[in-house]
UniProtKB/Swiss-Prot annotation:
Protein name listed in UniProt: Regenerating islet-derived protein 3-gamma
GO cellular component terms attached to this protein's record: extracellular space; secretory granule
C-type lectin domain sequence ranges: 47-171
Coiled coil residues, start to end: none
Comment block on domains: The EPN motif is essential for recognition of the peptidoglycan carbohydrate backbone and for efficient bacterial killing with Glu-114 playing a key role in peptidoglycan binding and bactericidal activity.
Induction conditions: Up-regulated in injured skeletal muscles and peripheral nerve.
Tissue-specific expression: Expressed in injured skeletal muscles and sciatic nerve (at protein level). Expressed in the pancreas. Expression increases during the acute phase of pancreatitis.
Thylakoid recorded as keyword: no
Pro-peptide positions on chain: 27-37
Its job: Bactericidal C-type lectin which acts exclusively against Gram-positive bacteria and mediates bacterial killing by binding to surface-exposed carbohydrate moieties of peptidoglycan. Restricts bacterial colonization of the intestinal epithelial surface and consequently limits activation of adaptive immune responses by the microbiota.
Length: 174
């Protein structure tokens, strides 16, 4: 018979081996489980948990946002980070949009009355923590809706007259 110390050591080794084996098998099982991917309608692309679509039929800012609202939780796109800005830019460029600025969900419902241009917000009420103005918006221009500018590669924002008719990008749930 084995001495008591050897038996205790072997028991711990066996227990450790079984625990390691169960962890490794558990990791393998996790890899076999299919991951859920969002499925976007034809003509739109997924980024994060949203679908994005560029519409080349020009509309005013208000009509464009209403058109986006026909989709689940849809609005004109809110651009919340540099990586999202790059994604939206690539979406627009890949469409062949050849020369117009593009509406996004940025607007100033105070019509320039908020001090220091503080009235700008996203149409879907997302918090504005990311700013990428091409030039600071003017409170006297009469332009209270936001676009992505062609000159910036569709990365930077500029104010525009809301009744101008432009292509637009919608952001919505799949």
């Amino acid at each position: 018979m084995l001495p008591r110390v050897a038996l205790t050591t072997m028991s711990w080794m066996l227990l450790s081996s079984l625990m390691l084996l169960s962890q490794v098998q558990g990791e393998d099982a996790k890899e076999d489980v299919p991951t859920s991917r969002i499925s976007c309608p034809k003509g739109s692309r997924a980024y994060g948990s949203y679908c994005y679509a560029l519409f080349s039929v020009s509309k005013s800012w208000f009509d464009a946002d209403l058109a986006c609202q026909k989709r689940p939780s849809g609005h004109l796109v809110s651009v919340l980070s540099g990586s999202e800005a790059s994604f939206v830019s690539s979406l627009i460029k890949s469409s062949g949009n050849s020369g117009q600025n593009v509406w996004i969900g940025l607007h100033d419902p105070t019509l320039g009355q908020e001090p220091n241009r503080g009235g700008w917000e996203w149409s879907n009420a997302d918090v504005m923590n990311y700013f990428n103005w091409e030039t600071n918006p003017s409170s006297v221009s009469g332009s209270h809706c936001g676009t992505l500018t062609r000159a910036s590669g569709f990365l930077r924002w500029r104010e525009n007259n809301c009744i101008s008719e432009l292509p637009y990008v919608c952001k919505f749930k799949a």
